[in-house]
Curated annotation (Swiss-Prot):
Keywords: Repeat. The lineage of its organism: Eukaryota, Viridiplantae, Streptophyta, Embryophyta, Tracheophyta. It comes from Arabidopsis thaliana. Belongs to the PPR family. PCMP-E subfamily. This is Pentatricopeptide repeat-containing protein At2g40720. The keyword Repeat applies.
Length: 860
């Protein structure tokens, strides 16, 4: 029977305790043999039994092994004892023992002791031993393990001053650690590369791998590729992994996947890191086809249950929007670790399957899988999106029930939840409890307040952020939210200051920041400033075009909006539903039916997805162009009807005199479970107004207040006065005005003035006109209305006086106008105008129509 040599030594070591004669060689051999087998505690016990009887028996070669055992067990007590023996024996300057002591103290968590050992060794009388690179490497590595990077780099530089020539390990730990921590500059990295070349250290594959990683961290992918090409032996899978992950992390996903295929074709034995790196590239590029191929390779390699690979597969399918495939991967995993659950919850959350994410979270708890901070942050984000305040608050409570570390991600998610749900006190409590308020935290609070329409509070928080920490530089997300807050408040002056600060930092070039600036100037009535921002941005981005098209529509420049849309098409940029919706608003304001129908057809031909907003815009366009039947067809085919959809159709029927259908649609809306708002009732009262349904209008007005608790605004009151006035109920209209809980504005008195003139009520007409003239003394149309009223009542002197006063003030009435589109041409007609080139034909038609109406009146 054959015995291994170290087994013989072990038996000797164990038996020598009982022997009367102690053999130092046997004990040393036994200790080293035990340590080689990993039986560290037995080795230390064996050492302690004999150290007291004779401290001089231990060999100089045994101490490094003993210190290795102390490091493995992190046993500081034994380590100090052995250190004492080393000092007594005078071997503390031995480079092997010094290295072992430094490593032991670092492993046991006492860096200061390691520094004392190293300093004593490096300052020893033996100048030759102080140049041993192994000890320096241990000390540099120790500094880095304790994240004391400045001291580590200082030690490396001191080593060079001492004339110690770094080896491949020295350079690799400096390069890899400093790159990882971001405390390394490109110039320093290239200097180290040059040092390697000059000293023929470029043959070490481990060091070259660290160099490749360094260049990728610097964003120098070409330099990384050059180093990779120079390596002759490419059999090491770690090298391939660094390249695959590096290109993927640099956004060069195609090269990352090409390298994956190259490694596979060169028979490199791929490991889990290879697959996770390649799947990461597929996730970034949303390359589901290649991702499926890698999935097949994973199954062939038997890694389909590897937690890291499975997590990457779930992430890849999630980023590609393939939630079904992610569910399949998840269900096939036998041992579902927390990382797997988290990846599936994140997949649901990222793809707007919020309720599925919450269901899976509940299932996790049923399976007694304890969530971590990553789980809870995703769950809270889902609650925020779904508006589930109470559920989110219950999840927040779990942070207090169990010792889950509250990360900045969780705190930011909670800030967004509470801010979005309008729970400002809770949001501020979370914010104040944060030890470190980073950019994400400030951004979450500001963004949440903006989404909830609390723009003043958002700007105050932004000001507090600048006062709290000057070193924080707002990112594009925060500046977008701040600009949106300025737009919501129409705070032009502050918005200009924000714009100026963004020009200095270069953030204005960001597409979302630029679009928010366009929106700001649009809402402040400065389309020319919005255009300047637009022209400074990339013309290839759809968001910028949409913002500018919407800006022109909002500022009553529909023709410019339509022209800009056509320019966008001519530059090869295909519109989305937002573009179509914005330009439809412009077309609606011009009542250009042909353009509207043409755009509708274009949308259908290109297969642009029609969301609710787009369909609402189409309904609005057809209603305003007088084609309510087209609007009705779109309405009936809509599966999801928003409140705006119902309001548009009710308004459409009412504006075309079909009050009965409008009222019927209102009943249908209530049956569908949609609650009306103030706009709904305004449309209904307006419908009754157009059709002369006085009692129905009065009932709806009372119904709005009593049954739905909606307080009427000035438009509701104006429509009611107009309804009563048109029906000739002038005294009731005047009593209605006097009973209003708010002071009547000019629109109310204008309605009463028009009705007074129609029904020849001079007294109320004069009263209304006087009220109007006090409110708007420069309004010429009021003078004209009152002059006409005087003339019709035979009060010519009063009319002449008022006409003289009007001329004295230089006032005149803007003539009303109407237009009609015929053969793709818009014909405009002004009240009292006769400048049309076809005026003769027009007057002939008008005379014939008048004769026909007179004849029909006589016949009836």
């Amino acid at each position: 029977m054959r015995f291994k040599l170290h087994d013989v030594h072990i038996r000797r070591g164990l038996c020598c305790v009982a022997d009367s004669y102690i053999s130092p060689a046997s004990i040393n051999s036994g200790i080293r043999a035990l340590i080689q087998k990993g039986e560290y505690l037995q080795a230390l016990h064996l050492y302690s039994k004999h150290d007291g009887s004779s401290p001089f028996w231990t060999s100089v070669f045994t101490f490094p092994s003993l210190l290795k055992a102390c490091s493995a067990l992190t046993n500081l007590s034994y380590g100090k004892t052995i250190h004492g023996s080393v000092v007594v024996l005078g071997w503390r300057y031995d480079p092997f023992i010094a290295t072992s002591l430094v490593n032991m103290y670092v492993k046991c968590g006492f860096l200061d002791y390691a520094v004392q050992v190293f300093d004593g060794w490096s300052q020893s009388q033996s100048g030759v031993s102080a140049r041993d690179v192994t000890v320096w490497n241990s000390m540099i590595d120790g500094y880095f393990k304790f994240r004391r990077f400045k001291e580590g780099v200082g030690c490396f530089r001191r080593m060079l001053v001492f004339g110690v020539r770094p080896d491949a390990f020295s350079l690799s730990i400096v390069v890899s650690v400093m790159c990882k921590e971001g405390n390394f500059r490109r110039e320093e990295g290239k200097q180290i590369h040059g040092f390697m070349l000059r000293n023929s250290l470029d043959t070490d594959s481990f060091l070259k791998t660290a160099l490749i990683d360094m260049y990728f961290k610097f964003g120098l992918s070409i330099d990384a590729w050059r180093v990779f090409v120079e390596i002759e032996d490419k059999s090491n899978v770690v090298l391939w992994n660094v390249m695959i992950v590096g290109f993927g992390g640099s956004g060069i996903c195609e090269s990352s996947l090409d390298l994956y295929m190259l490694a596979k074709n060169n028979s490199v034995k791929l490991v889990s890191t290879s697959f996770t790196g390649a799947l990461g590239a597929c996730s970034q590029s949303e390359n589901s086809g290649f991702g499926r191929q890698i999935h097949c390779d994973v199954v062939k390699m038997g890694l389909h249950n590897d937690p890291y690979v499975c997590t990457s597969l779930l992430s890849m399918y999630s980023k590609c929007g393939m939630v079904g495939e992610a569910e399949t991967v998840f269900s096939c995993v036998v041992d579902k670790r927390l990382e797997i659950w988290n990846a599936m919850v994140a997949a649901y959350a990222e793809n707007d399957y919020g309720y599925s994410a919450l269901d899976l979270f509940g299932f996790m708890r049923q399976k007694s899988v304890l969530p971590d901070s990553f789980t809870l942050s995703n769950v809270i984000s889902c609650c925020s999106v779904l508006g589930l305040y109470n559920y989110g608050k219950s999840v927040h409570a779990e942070l207090f029930k169990r010792p889950i570390q509250s990360t900045s991600t969780i705190e930011s998610a909670l800030l967004t939840l509470y801010s979005k749900c309008g729970c400002d006190p809770d949001a501020y409590l979370v914010f104040k409890s944060m030890e470190e308020k980073d950019m994400v935290a400030w951004g979450s609070l500001i963004s949440g307040l903006c989404k909830n329409g609390k723009f003043k509070e958002a700007l105050k928080v932004f000001g507090d952020m600048k006062d709290d920490d000057d070193s924080l530089k707002p990112d594009s997300d925060i500046m977008t939210s701040v600009t949106n807050a300025c737009a919501g408040l129409e705070a032009l002056r502050f918005g200009l200051q924000v714009h100026g600060s963004m020009i200095k930092t270069g953030l204005v070039l960001n597409v979302f920041v630029g679009s928010s600036l366009i929106d700001l100037y649009s809402k402040c009535g400065l389309p020319e400033m919005a255009l300047k921002v637009f022209t400074s941005m990339s013309t290839e981005n759809m968001v910028a075009w949409n913002s500018m098209i919407s800006c022109y529509s909002r500022n009553n420049l529909p023709e410019l909006s339509i022209d800009l849309f056509n320019l966008m098409l001519s530059q090869g940029i295909f519109p989305d539903s937002v573009s179509i919706t914005s330009v439809l608003v412009a077309i609606s304001s011009t009542a250009s039916l042909l353009k509207g129908k043409s755009l509708h057809g274009y949308t259908l031909r290109l297969g642009i997805p029609s969301d609710t907003h787009l369909k609402n815009a189409l309904i609005d366009m057809y209603v305003k162009c007088g084609f309510s039947k087209y609007a009705e067809n779109i309405f009936k085919k809509m599966q999801h009807k928003s409140l705006i959809t119902w309001n548009l159709m009710i308004y459409g029927y009412g504006s075309h005199g079909d009050c009965i259908t409008a009222l019927s649609l209102f009943d249908e809306m209530k049956k569908a479970g949609e609650s009306p708002d103030d706009v709904t009732f305004l449309s209904l009262i307006s419908a009754c107004n157009h059709s002369g349904f006085v009692e129905e209008g009065k009932n709806i007005f009372e119904f709005m207040k009593q049954d739905y608790g909606i307080e009427p605004n000035m438009e509701h009151y104006a429509n009611m006065v107009d309804l009563l006035g048109r029906a000739g109920l002038l005294e009731e209209a005047y009593s209605f005005i006097k009973a209003m809980p708010i002071e009547a504005d000019s629109s109310i008195w204008l309605c009463l003035l028009s009705a007074s003139r129609t029904h020849h009520n001079v007294e109320l007409g004069i009263l209304s006109a006087e009220k109007l003239l006090r409110m708007e003394p420069e309004r010429g149309s009021t003078y004209v209305q009152l002059i006409n009223l005087y003339m019709e009542a035979g009060l010519k002197n009063e009319a002449a006086k008022l006409l003289g006063l009007m001329k004295e003030k230089g006032l005149h009435k803007q003539p009303g106008c109407s237009w009609i589109e015929v053969s793709d041409r818009t014909n405009v007609f002004f009240s009292g105008g006769s400048s049309s080139p076809m005026k003769a034909e027009i007057f002939n038609v008008l005379n014939r129509l008048k004769s026909n109406m007179v004849d029909e009146d006589k016949a009836t």
